[in-house]
UniProtKB/Swiss-Prot annotation:
SMART domains attached to this UniProt entry: EFh
Residue numbers binding Ca(2+) 2: 69, 71, 73, 75, 80
Keywords: Acetylation, Calcium, Metal-binding, Muscle protein, Repeat
Lineage: Eukaryota, Metazoa, Ecdysozoa, Arthropoda, Crustacea
Cell wall biogenesis/degradation among keywords: no
Pfam families, alphabetized: EF-hand_5
Positions of Ca(2+) 1 binding: 17, 19, 21, 28
Physiological role: Like parvalbumins, SCPs seem to be more abundant in fast contracting muscles, but no functional relationship can be established from this distribution.
Subunit composition and interactions: SCPs from crayfish, lobster, and shrimp are polymorphic dimers; three isotypes (alpha-alpha, alpha-beta, and beta-beta) have been identified.
Domain EF-hand, chain residue ranges per copy: 4-39, 56-91, 100-135, 136-171
Protein name per its UniProtKB record: Sarcoplasmic calcium-binding protein, alpha-B and -A chains
Amino acid sequence: AYSWDNRVKYVVRYMYDIDDDGFLDKNDFECLAVRNTLIEGRGEFSAADYANNQKIMRNLWNEIAELADFNKDGEVTVDEFKMAVQKHCQGKKYSEFPGAFKVFIANQFKAIDVNGDGKVGLDEYRLDCITRSAFAEVKEIDDAYDKLTTEDDRKAGGLTLERYQDLYAQFISNPNESCSACFLFGPLKVVQ
């Protein structure tokens, strides 16, 4: 479940492919604009925030399509996305990623940081994990958090944005199946 191939499939399936049709397209990013607006507003819908999120997500889709829609059919398949990650991210640090990836990572952090304190603590990590997978025991999630975080992270109250960015970069660019970043999104399942 922690192979690089599965991790990239996981990102496509659970982070971007919001409409669950097996590929990325403009509709996924329109849906992400609504989702992000509601998450940021904690259920309240702000037309101004939505307009801003729509602009961000449209720009993000356009950039991802430019980087990954190799056959220019308006859809980015899992294989195309993997090729784009290999070309633009593999072996690179977060600071070297294309803007589209950076924007998405920052937005993902904002969505997980439910209380807005600038850190992702264990409680927020748990909430994020249960949105994508089913767990019979919370210990599975807590064990993954312990593998992900360092003592310094835990003393600080959780993952800062900078630390999250670094871990996300490792998650999609580091082929090592035992790196701590493999647990960024909790215990992973094999993506079919």
